[in-house]
Swiss-Prot record:
Disruption phenotype: Reduced levels of arabinogalactan proteins. Defects in root hair growth, root elongation, pollen tube growth, flowering time, leaf development, silique length and inflorescence growth. Increased sensitivity to salt stress. The keyword Transmembrane helix applies. It is found in: Golgi apparatus membrane. The gene is GALT2. Possesses hydroxyproline O-galactosyltransferase activity. Transfers galactose from UDP-galactose to hydroxyproline residues in the arabinogalactan proteins (AGPs). Is specific for AGPs containing non-contiguous peptidyl hydroxyproline residues. Utilizes UDP-galactose solely as sugar donor. The addition of galactose onto the peptidyl hydroxyproline residues in AGP core proteins represents the first committed step in arabinogalactan polysaccharide addition. AGP glycans play essential roles in both vegetative and reproductive plant growth. It holds the Pfam family Galactosyl_T. It comes from Arabidopsis thaliana (Mouse-ear cress). This is Hydroxyproline O-galactosyltransferase GALT2. The chain crosses the membrane at residues 23-43. GO terms for cellular component: endoplasmic reticulum; Golgi apparatus; Golgi membrane.
Amino acid sequence: MKRVKSESFRGVYSSRRFKLSHFLLAIAGFYLVFLAFKFPHFIEMVAMLSGDTGLDGALSDTSLDVSLSGSLRNDMLNRKLEDEDHQSGPSTTQKVSPEEKINGSKQIQPLLFRYGRISGEVMRRRNRTIHMSPFERMADEAWILGSKAWEDVDKFEVDKINESASIFEGKVESCPSQISMNGDDLNKANRIMLLPCGLAAGSSITILGTPQYAHKESVPQRSRLTRSYGMVLVSQFMVELQGLKTGDGEYPPKILHLNPRIKGDWNHRPVIEHNTCYRMQWGVAQRCDGTPSKKDADVLVDGFRRCEKWTQNDIIDMVDSKESKTTSWFKRFIGREQKPEVTWSFPFAEGKVFVLTLRAGIDGFHINVGGRHVSSFPYRPGFTIEDATGLAVTGDVDIHSIHATSLSTSHPSFSPQKAIEFSSEWKAPPLPGTPFRLFMGVLSATNHFSERMAVRKTWMQHPSIKSSDVVARFFVALNPRKEVNAMLKKEAEYFGDIVILPFMDRYELVVLKTIAICEFGVQNVTAPYIMKCDDDTFIRVESILKQIDGVSPEKSLYMGNLNLRHRPLRTGKWTVTWEEWPEAVYPPYANGPGYIISSNIAKYIVSQNSRHKLRLFKMEDVSMGLWVEQFNASMQPVEYSHSWKFCQYGCTLNYYTAHYQSPSQMMCLWDNLLKGRPQCCNFR
């Protein structure tokens, strides 16, 4: 019986083993079929990857094949993009043909000095991995759109652009002397009334409106001091004169910010705040809280006080509060009658109609409410009334009508229509064939024609730059509008100081421009130091040269306004996600408006980027701090040099660099330097 059982068990076991082997064979067969279907795609990917040898490989002189996988592959295969230099070997100077020397301009190609491959490296990473980071996807899209945009530039006839027309608006606008809008029309226009040609001295704007009743708002800062969870009653509104045409796609500068706060101010009193703002950087506020300002001649504005007096309650005091009624009667009885001072309450009240008149005077703005002068705000350097091309009214107020009269009837002097001045006086010298002291890369947006022109007319006229002891170049990407790109190309060909990067410009990709500056400073010129700055940064070139001359040439240098242990903002407008920056703090980094690195650091950055080992982050100044930290740890010690005179927020005394300077402020700062007075034109 045991033998029979044993035979029976063995039969069952062999049957199960037979079924398992069949199952494994089926899986193997399915896998072979899968490979057969995927093998052609695999061969195609291998061919694409093997077609690029990186930055150190030899490429042709005139073309660069850009290949992308996935759904974008068919769109970009076999795309030829021009590159004017040899891709292999070091290049130190620009070669200029005799014809170009005679004509004074050169034909601009889309990939100057191999910069297409900077963003191209980001693209090639897509061929090496299925998953792309948000940054890589963004760069991917910008590269493709930029390549197409550059092709469209060749089809666009720049000569057909009317110099009197705005390349931002696409049409010539009339300059009416008066404009009126009712409340409904204003709401349909997002509460903005256009003033096509700005204001002039004597222009006035009358606003008829009613402040809304206070509502509760959360103020987290107050929750620590009170038990109301930070909830306060707020009733306020803003009247702003904005420069709508001074920056396309940017926050317009606020030439005047008028903010009546009926309830909700931090001092629990009604106030009227006046200020200016340029590129989201506010100036010093002028606050009127009912205390009259001085009558000294140096603080008056066209003879008016900056702040008038009003009472702190709703009762109108017809007699000075320091005097009692008895004292006043006694003085009149003995013949020493004193004329009582008339005071008024705060000019705005919830639910009550007001008539506000804003008038542009000779030295400043004057605000009248109900026919009474309330405050005056002096014009600030760099902000001109002719640039005030829009009136915005926001906040807790119902507007019934707005009337603007005596407006400017001609286009502003610094408008984009007149931004570029094609004069040989402002042309850049050619790149020198010998080493020089400092290379300066200036980041600029495509449509910043006024900013670039202001830089050419000011600190780029420094003798060190004119003699090529210092070399400066703009680094500019492309714009969605083909007429803007066409004008950029014309500007670059004429002045010879622009390096065009063929990807679509956006803030998150500024770091690619920084890498381009490093590559240019290493492979196309010979300078021991490289400086990065912005087109709204005014540079005192002689001060910068003195600073780098004080550093030993053997040392690696990182100089600027350094930040230590700064943390990413995880909430709000400038949020940095944990995916973008997983660390809790940033490395030490210099503020982006102006910093200096030695050339060996730039070489390290270019080398790491060519080997795909460079970490890219959307904040270019933080990225530079990270790269310098890695260089300091792996290569050789770096001398970190800090100075507050690399001013991040505006201008400071004895500055090296001044940030957030408008074109008018640039001219003012340059005039001061020529007079031997390095003074700020607008303290912030």
